[in-house]
Amino acid sequence: MKFETWEPVYEEILRDFGFDRAADERARDVAAEYAQAFDLDRLSGINGQTVAIVGAAPSLTDTVERVSGADVTIAASTAADVVREAGYAVDIMVTDLDKNNDTAAELTHEGTIVAAHAHGDNIPAIQSWFPTADRSNVLTTTQAAPIETVDNFGGFTDGDRAAFLADAFGASELIFVGWEFDDPTVDNMKAQKLAWAEKLLYWLENRRGE
């Protein structure tokens, strides 16, 4: 997805949450200080494939075996741990570095691609995590305008960014595993983010004709 298409939605998200665009841009620029140029040809294996988009909902432990029906598995945040513990491979991890950062770093050293996201309130995590990772396996992303070493394929939360990434590189089918949009256990901010994830995925499905 081109940024020109994403930007109006991004601006709506900023208004809804009261987020500061300049803060996102600062985080992007800090991440760029650590990021290496990523060879996007490494994502060509997504093209024409069935891709599992794995969320970290509590139901994941009971449904994780569904990833076996996919050609490529993209796991969001702590879903990567559940997938691996169940004996399945994670091909790409998507994270904004707010939880299982040791897993994210370990995956990069194993050669797995980690899409690490920079946004307005995770600059300290960026500064502490990037030096621990094999940066040749880090795809650095932003929700603001992309720059040379920091990409934007669309999406807001870890989970929906995984779906937008798969779409951007030509996935033929998306399988959603471990997703719950109505989770009474989460706080108001998380509930608002889940509502946006649902809205964004509906938009993406319409764009894909699904």
Per-region residue spans from a language model:
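N-terminal donor/sugar-recognition subdomains of glycan-related enzymes
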Residues: 1-51, 61-63, 173, 179, ...
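Short N-terminal helix-initiation segments at or just after the protein's N-terminus
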Residues: 15-19, 57, 114-120
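Short, flexible, glycine/charge-rich loop motifs used to bind or transfer phosphoryl groups or to couple energy/partner
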Residues: 41-43, 61-65, 103-105, 165-166
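A glycine-rich, hydrophobic loop/mini-helix early in the fold
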Residues: 45-49, 53, 57-66, 70-99
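Short beta-strand segments
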Residues: 53-55, 115-117, 141, 176-178
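A broadly conserved detector of short glycine/acidic/proline-rich loop/turn motifs that flank catalytic sites
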Residues: 58, 120, 144, 180, ...
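Acidic/Gly/His-enriched mid-domain segments of enzyme catalytic cores or analogous surface patches
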Residues: 71, 80-171
